[in-house]
Amino acid sequence: MTNRPAAPSPWPARLDLLQSTSGLFLVLFMWLHMAFVSSIHLGEDAFWTVARFFEGAFVLDRPVPALVSAFALFVLLVIALHAGLALRKFPADWRQYRAFWTHMRGFGHQDTSLWPVQVATGFAMFFLASVHLYAMIVEPEAIDPYGSADQVWTGRAWPLLVVLLLCVEVHGVVGLYRLALKWGWPTFGDPARTRRVLKRAMWALIALFIGTGLVTLDTFARIGKAHAPHAGELYTPPFLQGPSGQ
C-alpha cells in the first residue's frame, strides 16, 4: 500500500482570488467615486443632482440618505476584508522581513520594489479611508456642494484628503498593474512588451487621477472658503428656492 501525498488545499487559491476580486472592486469604486466628485466642475447644481441620484431621489421620489450610508458601510467592510486577506502575505516576524529586504535589494527589480509601496499605502489608506467613510455613514445628507466644501475648508479635512488621495491612487493603480501581471491579462505581444505597456499605463493613470483629485479638492476648498461665513448651510438649487430666492 503506497502512501500518497495529501492533495493540496484549494483554500489558498480561493482566498487569493477573493483578494484579487475585492481589490478590483475597490479600484472600480475609486474611479466611480472620482467621477462623482468631479461633477463639481460642472457646477453646484450638477454635484447636487448626482448626490441626490445616489440617494434614490429620482426613483423613490424622495432622497433616502440611508442608501449612501449603507453603501459606504459595505465599502468599509470590503476594505477590511481586502486588508485581512493581504495580511496573509505579510512577513510574520523580523527574520522574514530581513529575508525579504535582502532578496529585494538583491533582485534590484522595480516590480519587486512596488510591494513595500503597496504595504505602506495600504496601511495608511485603511485608517484614512475609514475616517472618510465614517463621515459618509453618519452624515450622508452632508454630501452636498456646500456640505462637502465646508468639510474640506471649514472642517479642515483637506490635509487628510490630500494624503488619502495620494495613497488611494498609488495603491489602487499599482495594485491593478500587479493584478494584470498576475492573471496575464491584458497582453500586448511578448511578456516584456506587455510589462512595458502596462507600466506606462500605470504611471499615466496615477498622474491622471492624482491630478484630477487635486484640482477637484482645490475647487471644493475655494467653494468652502467663499461659503465659510455660512458654514453648515446646505445648498438649495434655484428650482427649489422660493419666490424670494431663499
Segments (PLM) and residue ranges:
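Membrane-embedded alpha-helical bundles that constitute the cytochrome b-like, heme-associated redox core
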Residues: 1-246
